[in-house]
């Protein structure tokens, strides 16, 4: 029996081979197909960028964005691979562009009106298919944009001049509220309060606690910035999300109380024309069934946080630049005296404040706050000879482009860079085209009003050795000073006194 078992003639060799060969063939074919797929993926891409390398490339590039921040990672990759290059974010092919011709193409075409970001992250903060800033549903975005456009132009823009000037005067009269024990002014907090107050009066009209809401806005922004590109697995770990959940809830709860008060005032108003504003228009649209309550609340929230979040930092950087460049301050003061004199600033002064406007433009070019734009291709396209597939993410690196093309002294702060008219394709601090910043005109007017009103009353100085170039910053969704660092305060000296303001 044993010999029979050991005898090869008792085995059906043909049967054994026929069973083994198909299994081996399938394994070899699968491996070959996978290798061909990887090889084909890398070889068919003509766009410069890091290697795919069996999926490790996308993992590394996404981790770099999470570690360095969006803005810093974009600068790193453009410097390494050129002004039109490809990485992966959230596993999706993403182009990083700092070339003006390519940016112009993306901004002007309607098939790039969508943005991109983690769906779970945007749901977490309430922006997924709601509001305007990161609403990636083109139909819903188009439904709310007219409300923003109407509120931020025409009569609203004219009203803003007086409202903003009054708010600045009111806050400067109470400057001790934002001074430390040495009399140094916390400019960021001051600007955030002024802009929140102005936005509230214009768009909501409900009394609020500025100090508390400003803190909540910063917490919300930190959550938004931190969660925008997080992988889905992050949101399945509850303890990782807890801090951000509280920050988002704090602002949303505070805003909901204010908006409910607005609803009550509308329902009990004897004359509706007395309370018609941005929030009222949205609430009426909700009653007509055009918008959901959640979308209305998110739109109002975004309208109130926009200026305290970004424009306040822009003016903060501007004041530091004024302190470092006294000749620029002198030129601005001469123009302010000539155009405005001793009276209140008016809307018809805006076009005459050319030096102030050039200063604002050069400040936004040299030290931007919003230095990138995130978009998604909604259809196949070709940009500067490179094929772009539908669904491709695109990041426009505006800050880098503003230092690469056209300007005679791109790495210096000088008004010479705007001595001549700059073609708008080379300077886009607010973007342009169908998804340009809805508030770009009112933002420019608001910054002029703030600078004129403040500089007429105070000369500004930084603490010794402080300037924007040496300031620690975080370059993520936007570029902000590191507020954990010291000596971000400034010294305000009244124009009619040689002594520093004592708060």
UniProtKB/Swiss-Prot annotation:
Cofactor: heme
A biological process term (GO) from this entry: lipid metabolic process
Subcellular location: Endoplasmic reticulum membrane; Microsome membrane
Enzyme nomenclature, EC number: 1.14.14.14
Membrane topology: Multi-pass membrane protein
Pathway: Steroid hormone biosynthesis
Top-level taxon of the source organism: Eukaryota
Record carries keyword Protein transport: no
Short name of one Pfam family: p450
Catalytic activity: testosterone + 3 reduced [NADPH--hemoprotein reductase] + 3 O2 = 17beta-estradiol + formate + 3 oxidized [NADPH--hemoprotein reductase] + 4 H2O + 4 H(+); androst-4-ene-3,17-dione + 3 reduced [NADPH--hemoprotein reductase] + 3 O2 = estrone + formate + 3 oxidized [NADPH--hemoprotein reductase] + 4 H2O + 4 H(+); androst-4-ene-3,17-dione + reduced [NADPH--hemoprotein reductase] + O2 = 19-hydroxyandrost-4-ene-3,17-dione + oxidized [NADPH--hemoprotein reductase] + H2O + H(+); 19-hydroxyandrost-4-ene-3,17-dione + reduced [NADPH--hemoprotein reductase] + O2 = 19-oxo-androst-4-ene-3,17-dione + oxidized [NADPH--hemoprotein reductase] + 2 H2O + H(+)
Molecular function as annotated in GO: aromatase activity; estrogen 2-hydroxylase activity; heme binding; iron ion binding
Main location: endoplasmic reticulum
Matches recorded under CDD domains: CYP19A1
Residues annotated to bind heme: 437
GO cellular component: endoplasmic reticulum membrane
Listed PANTHER family: AROMATASE, CYTOCHROME P450 FAMILY 4
Protein name: Aromatase
Gene this protein is translated from: CYP19A1
């Amino acid at each position: 029996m044993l010999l029979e078992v050991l005898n090869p003639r008792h085995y059906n060799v043909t049967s054994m081979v026929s069973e083994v060969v198909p299994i081996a063939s399938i394994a070899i074919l699968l491996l070959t197909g996978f290798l061909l797929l990887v090889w084909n993926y890398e070889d068919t891409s003509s766009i410069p960028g890091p290697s795919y390398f069996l999926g490790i490339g996308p993992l590394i590039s996404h981790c770099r964005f999470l570690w360095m921040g969006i803005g810093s990672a974009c600068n790193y990759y453009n410097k390494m691979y050129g002004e039109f290059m490809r990485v992966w974010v959230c596993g999706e092919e993403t182009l990083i562009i700092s070339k003006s011709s390519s940016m112009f193409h993306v901004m002007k075409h309607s098939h790039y009106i969508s943005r991109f970001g983690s769906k779970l992250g945007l749901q977490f903060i309430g922006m997924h298919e709601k509001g305007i800033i990161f609403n990636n549903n083109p139909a819903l975005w188009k439904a709310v944009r007219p409300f923003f456009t109407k509120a931020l132009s025409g009569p609203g823009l004219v009203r803003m001049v007086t409202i903003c000037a009054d708010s600045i005067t009111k806050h400067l009269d109470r400057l001790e509220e934002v001074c430390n024990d040495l009399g140094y002014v916390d400019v960021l907090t001051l600007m955030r309060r002024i802009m929140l107050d102005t936005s509230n009066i214009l768009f909501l009209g409900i009394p609020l606690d500025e100090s508390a809401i400003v803190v909540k806005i910063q917490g919300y922004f930190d959550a938004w910035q931190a969660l925008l590109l997080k992988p889905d697995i992050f949101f399945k770990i509850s303890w990782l999300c807890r801090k951000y959940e509280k920050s988002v809830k704090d602002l949303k709860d505070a805003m909901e109380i204010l908006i409910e008060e607005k609803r009550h005032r509308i329902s009990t108003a004897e004359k509706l024309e007395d309370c018609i504003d941005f929030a009222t228009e949205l609430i009426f649209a909700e009653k007509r069934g055009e918008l959901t309550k959640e979308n209305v609340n998110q739109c109002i929230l975004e309208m109130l946080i926009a200026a305290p979040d970004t424009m306040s930092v822009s003016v903060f950087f501007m004041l530091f630049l004024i302190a470092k460049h006294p000749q620029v301050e002198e030129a601005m003061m001469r123009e302010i005296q000539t155009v405005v004199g001793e009276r209140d600033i008016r809307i018809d002064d805006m076009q005459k404040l050319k030096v102030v406007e050039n200063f604002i433009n050069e400040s936004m070019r040299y030290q931007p706050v919003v230095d990138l734009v995130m978009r998604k291709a909604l259809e196949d396209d070709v940009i500067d000879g490179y094929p772009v597939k539908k669904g491709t993410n695109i990041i426009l690196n505006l800050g880098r482009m503003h230092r690469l093309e056209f300007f005679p002294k791109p790495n210096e702060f000088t008004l010479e860079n705007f001595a001549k008219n700059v073609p708008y394709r080379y300077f886009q601090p607010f973007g342009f085209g169908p998804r340009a910043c809805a508030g770009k005109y009112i933002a420019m007017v608001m910054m002029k009003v703030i600078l004129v009103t403040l500089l007429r009353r105070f000369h500004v100085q930084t603490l010794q050795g402080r300037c924007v170039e040496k300031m620690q910053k975080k370059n993520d969704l936007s570029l902000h000073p590191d507020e954990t660092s010291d000596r971000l305060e400034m010294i305000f000296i009244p124009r009619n006194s040689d002594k520093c303001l004592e708060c």
